[in-house]
Amino acid sequence: MDWNGTSADGYTGVDVVKGMLDITSNPAFMAVADGDMSNQLASGNLAACVSGTWDAITAKEIFGDGYAATKLPTFTVGDKQVQQGSVAGYKYVGVNGYSENSGWAVLLAEYLTNEESQQMFFDQRESGPSNKNVAASDSVQENVALAALAAQSEYAQAQKVGGKYWDPAKTFGELIAQGTLSADDDNAIQEALDNLVEGAAASVE
C-alpha cells in the first residue's frame, strides 16, 4: 500500500502521520530506543509497551499476574479507526556448500534447527519455534506472546525492504516520536514523507 499517496480507503500519507502524531503527543506516550525496552520495563515507568516476543520474558516478570499481550490496537485516521499494521519476517539457516568446512556447517545447521534446540530457544527466549513438533506443543500453543503475534499476523506484511530503508525510516520515526512535526503543517509532513520514500528507494551502491 502506498501510504505516501492515497490508499484504496481514501487515506493519504499525511492523514496517517497526523494519526501517529496524535498518539505521540499524548503525555502517556514514551518513545523507547531500540534495545532499551527491557530497561524501561524494569524501571517501572511502563504500564504497557509495543515490542516483540524477545521482551516477553522480562514483561512477564515485571507485570506478574497483570501480564497480558494482544495484537496492535486501532488508531484514529481522520474520523475512522484503522487497524495498525506491522511487518513479519523469518530467518533462514543456510549452509555454504563450497565452504572448506561445509560438513561441519551442515552439522551446525542441523543442531540449531533440530527439535531439542528449538525447544531450548523457546524455553529461554519464548521465540517462535520453526520445528513442527515444538510448535505443536501445548506450551507453545498456550503462550500469551506468541498468541498475540499470531493475531497480529493477519495485519502484517512480509518484510521486503532493501538496505537503504532503515536509516530513512529511523529518521522519519524520530521526527514523529520527538514531536518535531506539527499536525497542523501538512507541507512539512508531506516533505518528511517524500524524504522517507526518496531515501528508502535510493539505489544501493
Description of each model-found segment:
Residues 12-19, 100-112, 120, 185-188, ...:
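Short amphipathic alpha-helical coupling segments at ligand-binding clamshell hinges
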Residues 2-31:
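Glycine-centered hinge/linker elements that transmit conformational signals in sensory
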Residues 61-124:
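Extracytoplasmic/periplasmic substrate-recognition and gating elements
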Residues 29-42:
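Short helix-initiation/N-cap motifs at beta->coil->alpha
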Residues 1-2, 87-95, 166-177:
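Periplasmic solute-binding protein
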Residues 150-205:
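Conserved C-terminal helix/tail region of periplasmic/extracytoplasmic solute-binding proteins
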